[in-house]
Structure formats: C-alpha cells, structure tokens
Amino acid sequence: MLETPAGRLWLKRVETLTLRWRLLKGGGQRSFEKDRDGLHFLGEAGMPVAPILAEGPDYFVTPDLGVTLRALMSDTGASDDRRAAFHAAGRALAALHAQGFSHGRPAVRDLCWDGAEVRFIDMERFSPRHQSPRHFAADIFVFVHSVFAAGGGEAELENALTAYRNAGGPLQASIALARRLRWIGPAARGLRRLKPHSRDLTALEPTLAYIASAR
C-alpha cells in the first residue's frame, strides 16, 4: 500500500513462490500476467474492476477501492453498509455475466466496496473464453461458499442473490449444479472429522443446500 497526496494506492508485484506454491498456483509471473491482463480486458469492456494506473513488466498500481466484503463482514457495526455492499455485489456479478464474462473466483475477499459500488480485484482465474452458464454457475458457487466460509449466512446472501436475480442474473444453472453436487455434503461432513477446523469444508454443505433451494 502506498500513501500519496492523490490518495491511497496499491502496488502489486510478481510473487516469488516456493516450489510447493508454484505446483499449487502455477508460476508467479503467469498469475501476475493473468491478473493484469484480466483487469485490462474487463476494464476496457466497461466492467466494474480495479483500474490500472501505472504498470511495468513486474508490477502494476491500482487505486484503493475501499473495504473488501470479507472485512466488512467482520465489522459488526456496519449492518446498513453491509446490506448495501452485498446488494451492489449481486448487481456487479449480474453485470459481468450479462456481458458473457465470468470472474473465475469472486470470493468476498476479491470484491471491494467504496460506499457506492462494488468492484472486482484479483483476476488470476479470469479467462475471456469462460463464457458459458457453467462458468456463471461456478462463480455463484464460489461467492456463496466464500460467504459461509467467512462466517456469514443467509442475510448477506439474500441481499446479493436478490439483486443478482433482479438484474437478470441467470440462477437456474447454479441451482441445477448444486442439486447435482448435493452428494458432496455428506462426504464433506465425513472429511470434517479429519479436519474439524476447516472453514472451507464446513461451508460446503450449507453452500449446496442454499443454492439448491434458491428460487
């Protein structure tokens, strides 16, 4: 983070990864380039993403876009702001899908709220080729799962998915996917005996149940 007379800026550089993380995430340069290229591509398409203010071969700079939805969920005194932010998140995701784009990983830590709108960051999983209802359904799954994993629940999701649906977001593919994958819930329950503190495993069953019952 950089404090400047023009405001707060964020500097992103190529990550230096250990062998283990390179195997899991791919090379740091490749992830950096996908993130930067995704921000450029979607920004030029008029989508709500972080604008790149300056860049070089191994860095780029974006403005501060406010608080992430993940951080906002931890602020117990921001209930009105949280409702507005999740409503805006649903609209932003619907706008992305309406133009035939998917984010790839729209988790609550990758959506920023500035008090007026939600914008997306971290586009390492974005691909302009991922344009099908299956990819939109995966976005919804990642978003809902991230809410439950962060300790949120139906209040936040109702705001987001109502706004998503009202803005023309296609939920039917997400509902169908969740119903097909319901068998994962009991399997995750068994795995939690081995990893009882895993938030990701704990969030799987409520994620599938919530999406499968959506209307």
Task: Annotate each predicted stretch with a short phrase.
Residues 42, 92-96:
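Conserved hydrophobic alpha-helix
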Residues 15, 31-32, 49-87:
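Conserved structural core of kinase catalytic domains
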Residues 119, 123-215:
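C-lobe/activation-segment region of protein kinase-like
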Residues 110-122:
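Conserved protein kinase catalytic/activation segment
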Residues 98-108:
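Catalytic-loop of the protein kinase fold
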Residues 1-33:
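ATP-binding glycine-rich loop module of kinase domains
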Residues 30-33, 37-49:
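Structural motif at the C-terminus of the N-lobe alphaC helix and the adjacent alphaC-beta4 loop
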